[in-house]
Amino acid sequence: MGSRDHLFKVLVVGDAAVGKTSLVQRYSQDSFSKHYKSTVGVDFALKVLQWSDSEMVRLQLWDIAGQERFTSMTRLYYRDASACVIMFDVTNATTFSNSQRWKQDLDSKLTLPSGEPVPCLLLANKSDLSPWAVSRDQIDRFSKENGFTGWTETSVKENKNINEAMRVLVEKMMNNSREDIMSSSTQGNYINLQTKPSPGWTCC
């Protein structure tokens, strides 16, 4: 029996200089550099995982520049994404509070086929630095109030919790994919023209 491929698009967003590009490089190539140029627009990377004996997962990682939240281009960048990562710098309170704006922007422009928000992890990056500008209790409350799948502290520099966090996200996407397949198989071919569009869907 051949291997089955799953292709997922994952957004990596957050303010400038919180470590998005470093995260993508660390996760996709297991490399780290202190010297990265600011991303202009969007950058891409691919991560391939042998998920099981019969399943291969290919992740398209979209590293979106911090200033892009203020442009109309984000709708184009977000299209067809299966999940997202929102990052902030634990030593910078402004990047933490702006995570809410990033989440709101995502939720207003992107949903799963079911109409539900895409799974989204909140990563408290640069946890190797001190002092922290926000407490763990603040982050935990913020994560719950804003509908994140969950949060964890990370250090891209020290490679702390990167693979573990992404595995949680992949598991969530795989579960959603299986649910979509099950839903499609039970619906048959009948088209119900009276069904209202799912919340969050807009005509492009």
From Swiss-Prot:
One Pfam family named in its UniProt record: Ras
* Keyword Phosphoprotein listed: yes
SUPFAM superfamilies assigned to the protein according to its UniProt record, in alphabetical order: P-loop containing nucleoside triphosphate hydrolases
Cited function: The small GTPases Rab are key regulators in vesicle trafficking. Essential for maintaining the integrity of endosome-trans-Golgi network structure. Together with LRRK2, plays a role in the retrograde trafficking pathway for recycling proteins, such as mannose 6 phosphate receptor (M6PR), between lysosomes and the Golgi apparatus in a retromer-dependent manner. Recruits LRRK2 to the Golgi apparatus and stimulates LRRK2 kinase activity. Stimulates phosphorylation of RAB10 'Thr-73' by LRRK2. Regulates also neuronal process morphology in the intact central nervous system (CNS).
Q: Please, where does S-geranylgeranyl cysteine lipid attachment map on the chain? A: C203, C204
| Subcellular location as annotated | Cell membrane; Cytoplasm; Cytoplasm, Perinuclear region; Golgi apparatus
Tell me which residues bear Phosphoserine. S72
Q: Which gene encodes it?
A: Rab29
Annotated source species:
Rattus norvegicus (Rat)
Which GO cellular component terms are attached?
A: cis-Golgi network; cytoplasm; cytoskeleton; cytosol; early endosome; endomembrane system; Golgi apparatus; Golgi membrane
Write out the GO MF terms. dynein complex binding; GDP binding; GTP binding; GTPase activity; kinesin binding; small GTPase binding
What's one GO BP annotation on this UniProt entry? synapse assembly
- Give residues where Phosphothreonine occurs: T71
Tissue note: Expressed predominantly in kidney and much less in brain, heart, muscle, fat, liver, spleen, adrenal gland, ovary, thymus and lung. Not expressed in testis and intestine.
The keyword Cell membrane is assigned to this record: yes
Q: State the name under which the record lists this protein.
A: Ras-related protein Rab-7L1
